[in-house]
């Protein structure tokens, strides 16, 4: 080593002024013993699980002085019968509509199931345990009434709360107080995917939410409870297709999130396909294309008779070129018997309105289709398919293709294909497509009272939210708190009601979509989620007070 470097260290005489970075003085912690606690709850006696069901769990133990890391286990029954069936990914979180922790009828903390799910997107273990597996999410088929479509299993839902942030520091101190955790469940229709053949009514009649609640309880000797702060999410839904929404009673808010949800109406949410466990954009498109190909190209001795009268099928000529208006499609199927012909469906799914002369035709989105016909199975094995089908095409519900706005008979598939359509009622879908790929917001403006708090014409708040949360959740978020937890009170924007600063108003400009595309006509709903700041004290039981002004 260079002598100059050595002398600069040895000869330095200000050691007393410096802090040791090679060791620390170890502190003796408070004496405590953690343990796992499991509780059976009381479930409301509702004979029909297609309505909201409520389970309550009471926690009171003279030896447990603090708790954290709440876990809800949900038993999913064995599923038997005829038809196609699967559970939505992360089914445990989708089971939950609302959860609250209360003491003597005062709510300490509450959250929706969707907010719980969003908070755990960076926790792969929590997501997997909540019901993300091939066994649960793959669409399985039963052929006879005694066929087992799904085995019974249990999913474990981590209910992430502010009391888990810093383990013992942030744990909920009970102070010899009874705690009640209440879980409201979603209808069964929100957690399953099925076709029209599956006996949904019988399944709902027999379905019962069987649950247990677990948590980590701490036995603490001489606990010294200190005041603390927690953030509680609060959400507001805007009016359908309106570009503005307002959150009132804003006093101390640590963040604001904005996103769009699709609204399909009261009609059955039927879609043409669903990939099941694998959820990439490619998986969605591949499954959709496979469904269409069964009707798009057929081999028959005469023109197929199993399509509706409005279906237009043409015989593929020897050249293999099928022309639909200004589009040429190349179709070649090998090994076709001499007494049979290849037919192409030229209007499998079409959409048009009186205001627009352009017809949206999915048959025109295919450019090349090649394959080999198997006479023994009467099926075509496709070897190459070139197309421009995208995720928005996949995300169009059947009801839009068949709606009154469409001047055409939009759905010209065979009855066999229509019977394979799936009912999907996922309440956690964001954006207007299944993967939230289409950024439906082109401009965002947030006002605090009458003053513009933030404005953007590019999705900077969305990019930063993905970066800071380490996951993609499709939300634009303004964070007002970057303060380290436990030792510091979270920073917030503070209300000033005398100047009208007690509400957050959000206005968005929706991205321009092609009015010829059916996705244009899906209703949109603006959703705002803010996190209000509360102070937790233990003067006489557990008290949670909303922060009204700067303290």
UniProtKB/Swiss-Prot annotation:
Membrane topology: Peripheral membrane protein
Intracellular or extracellular location(s): Membrane
Keywords carried by this UniProt record: Membrane
GO biological process, one term: response to antibiotic
Domain of life, source organism: Viruses
Chief location of this protein within or outside the cell: membrane
GO cellular component: membrane
Note: Displays structure similarities to capsid proteins.
Family as reported in the entry's similarity comment: Belongs to the poxviridae protein D13 family.
Subunit structure: Homotrimer. Self-assembles to form a layer. Interacts with A17 (via N-terminus); this interaction is necessary for D13 association with membranes.
Function: Scaffold protein which forms a transitory spherical honeycomb lattice providing curvature and rigidity to the convex membrane of crescent and immature virions (IV). This association occurs concomitantly with viral membrane formation. Targeted by the drug rifampicin, which prevents the formation of this lattice, and hence virus morphogenesis. In the presence of rifampicin, irregularly shaped membranes that lack the honeycomb layer accumulate around areas of electron-dense viroplasm.
Protein name per UniProt: Scaffold protein D13 ortholog
Origin species: Swinepox virus (strain Kasza) (SWPV)
Taxonomic classification: Viruses, Varidnaviria, Bamfordvirae, Nucleocytoviricota, Pokkesviricetes
């Amino acid at each position: 080593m260079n002598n100059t470097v050595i002398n600069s260290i040895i000869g330095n005489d200000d050691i007393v002024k410096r802090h040791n970075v090679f060791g620390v003085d170890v502190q003796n912690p408070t004496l405590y013993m953690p343990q796992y606690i499991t509780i059976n709850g009381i479930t409301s006696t509702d004979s029909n699980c297609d309505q909201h069901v409520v389970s309550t769990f009471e926690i009171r133990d003279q030896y447990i002085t603090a708790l954290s890391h709440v876990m809800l286990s949900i038993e999913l029954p064995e599923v038997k019968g005829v038809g196609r069936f699967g559970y939505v990914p992360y089914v445990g979180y989708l089971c939950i509509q609302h959860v609250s922790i209360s003491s003597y009828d005062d709510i300490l903390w509450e959250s929706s199931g969707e907010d719980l799910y969003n908070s755990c997107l960076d926790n792969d273990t929590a997501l997997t345990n909540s019901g993300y597996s091939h066994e649960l999410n793959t669409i399985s088929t039963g052929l006879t009434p005694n066929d087992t479509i799904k085995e019974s299993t249990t999913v474990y839902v981590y209910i992430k709360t502010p009391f888990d942030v810093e383990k013992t520091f942030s744990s909920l101190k009970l102070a010899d107080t009874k705690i009640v955790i209440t879980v409201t469940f979603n209808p069964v229709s929100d957690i399953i995917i099925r076709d029209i053949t599956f006996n949904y009514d019988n399944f709902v009649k027999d379905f019962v939410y069987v649950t247990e609640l677990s948590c980590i309880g701490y036995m603490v000797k001489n606990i010294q409870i200190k005041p603390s702060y927690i953030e509680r999410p609060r959400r507001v839904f805007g009016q359908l297709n309106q570009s503005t929404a307002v959150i009132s009673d804003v006093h101390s808010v640590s963040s604001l999130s904005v996103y769009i949800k699709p609204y399909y109406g009261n009609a059955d949410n039927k879609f043409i396909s669903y990939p099941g466990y694998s959820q990439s954009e490619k998986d969605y498109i591949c499954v959709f294309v496979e469904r269409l190909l069964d009707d798009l190209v057929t081999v028959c001795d005469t023109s197929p008779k199993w399509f509706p009268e409005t279906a237009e099928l043409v015989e593929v000529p020897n050249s293999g070129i099928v022309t639909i208006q200004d589009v040429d499609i190349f179709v070649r199927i090998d090994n076709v018997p001499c007494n049979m012909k290849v037919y192409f469906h030229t209007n499998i799914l079409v959409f048009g309105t009186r205001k627009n002369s352009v017809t949206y035709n999915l048959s025109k989105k295919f450019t090349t289709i090649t394959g080999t016909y198997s006479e023994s199975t009467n099926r075509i094995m496709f070897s190459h398919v070139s197309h421009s089908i995208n995720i928005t095409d996949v995300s169009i519900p059947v009801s839009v293709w068949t709606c009154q706005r469409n001047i055409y008979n939009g759905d010209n598939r065979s009855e066999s294909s229509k019977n394979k359509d799936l009912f999907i009622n996922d309440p956690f879908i964001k954006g207007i497509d299944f993967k939230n790929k289409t950024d439906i917001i082109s401009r965002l403006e947030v006002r605090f009272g009458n003053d513009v708090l933030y404005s953007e014409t590019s999705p900077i708040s969305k990019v930063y939210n993905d970066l800071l949360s380490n996951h993609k959740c499709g939300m634009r978020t303004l964070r007002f708190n970057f303060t380290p937890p436990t030792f510091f009170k979270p920073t917030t924007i503070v209300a000033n009601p005398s100047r009208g600063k007690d509400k957050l108003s959000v206005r968005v400009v929706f991205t321009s979509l092609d009015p010829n595309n059916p996705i244009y006509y899906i209703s949109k709903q603006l959703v705002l989620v803010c996190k209000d700041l509360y102070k937790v004290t233990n003067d006489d039981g557990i008290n949670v007070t909303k922060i009204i002004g700067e303290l």
